[in-house]
């Protein structure tokens, strides 16, 4: 394993010790909740333009290179890695031995080396703490995080003063000039998303929970569309809130913690998340008042304020961090146009179509430099920034899993209805969406009467327990039906234009929307 030279090395400190170091180092302060509060300067979200993957013989033909998966030469990586090692050699560093993947067959051992104590705490909160020597002879991946080291675009061959570089062949992840902790977890997510498909495991940007009888539900969606909120269900057991694998025999969490958005967090609406923000947790870019009390409504630092906490802080959880193959799969889409239904039942071909499309919204975007407010987007696999291989690799695996299990896939709109965003529409309330989810998970939704929504050709229920019937057909929620048709046709055209880039069987392409009539 790679040796790290440093002025002082702290290895496998406890969360309490890491918190003490972070406060002593001036990295953060303790809030009234007991959680460690930190700020990350100008980088309050991910920096997709600064993420690179080393292009070599192993990866050249396997990665979908482009604006998302930007190639970097091995030599460029090596030079920056050495610069980071020299930088860290003059400082105190924190090292923890962790793992990603809660499945004995597919986990990866990790050696996390950080300049900041709080980044190491973040890794301990979000990754899995192994019991004993659990590496089983597997070689460790090394994460090197040096947020205080700035890059020079001309000298270092990068785009700004920071970079994330993933070296899939050498099992190394390098983060320099990146104080935002989300980069650490998403880098390893990208690694697993590359490594697992050849092993017949579908990696997924989704939350997962289980019912009393062990039935499993998956919630796919971009940040801010409801994954964490809806999976933290007071009547179900959490597996995880963000990253999972689906093998032939199980669903398993990649992580050992949660990373919840905090903007406008309320104890009433999201009690499980609220109660998890305590000693041992981290609040990232949450504004505190003079008494250290968090103001979750204050977005002056960012809309993307966050809390990181271990899974153990959620009382209702699946202890072994995994479950059986899913009984229900929910694609959470946040529709700004207000033309999609609150819920629709998808065929497996429609599931592949909407999975590849990934239509949703960027809500309080997690990316640096994004426009404030809400914008619609198509994000392949409901997580385009994290999937290195061609999208059809993941879509084919999804269809294979659906065919093998017979699980029902649903499209759930957590966005607007009765009109478009900012033009008279209203967002579905969390209680309404929870009622939809409850109807899905009860199994009764797919047994009741349905109708087909024109244009989108989606099968929608005529009734759902706890939901007003008139909300189920979006066309009926608009006062001006012709205005609905115009808006729906506009979105259908966007779907078609976006889907042109995919080379897929005709059955999948034809499962998409047609003209409104």
UniProtKB/Swiss-Prot annotation:
Enzyme class: lyase
Cofactor(s) the record lists: Mn(2+)
Record pathway: Carbohydrate biosynthesis; gluconeogenesis
Gene Ontology molecular functions: ATP binding; metal ion binding; phosphoenolpyruvate carboxykinase (ATP) activity
Alphabetized InterPro entries for the sequence: PEP_carboxykinase_ATP, PEP_carboxykinase_C, PEP_carboxykinase_N, PEPCK_ATP_CS
GO cellular component: cytosol
Localization (cell): Cytoplasm
Reactions catalysed according to its record: oxaloacetate + ATP = phosphoenolpyruvate + ADP + CO2
Protein's GO biological process: gluconeogenesis
Residues that, per the record, bind Mn(2+): 186, 205, 242
Entry EC number(s): 4.1.1.49
Matches recorded under SUPFAM superfamilies: PEP carboxykinase N-terminal domain, PEP carboxykinase-like
Keyword terms of this UniProt record: ATP-binding, Cytoplasm, Decarboxylase, Gluconeogenesis, Lyase, Manganese, Metal-binding, Nucleotide-binding
Chain positions recorded as ATP binding sites: 186, 205, 221-229, 270, 306, 433
Keyword Ribonucleoprotein belongs to the record: no
Annotated residues for binding of substrate: 46, 180, 186, 306
Quaternary structure and interacting proteins, as annotated: Monomer.
Family to which the UniProt record says this protein belongs: Belongs to the phosphoenolpyruvate carboxykinase (ATP) family.
Biological role: Involved in the gluconeogenesis. Catalyzes the conversion of oxaloacetate (OAA) to phosphoenolpyruvate (PEP) through direct phosphoryl transfer between the nucleoside triphosphate and OAA.
NCBIfam families documented for this protein: pckA, PRK09344.1-2, PRK09344.1-3, PRK09344.1-5
Name of the featured protein: Phosphoenolpyruvate carboxykinase (ATP)
Naturally occurring in which organism (per UniProt): Coxiella burnetii (strain CbuG_Q212)
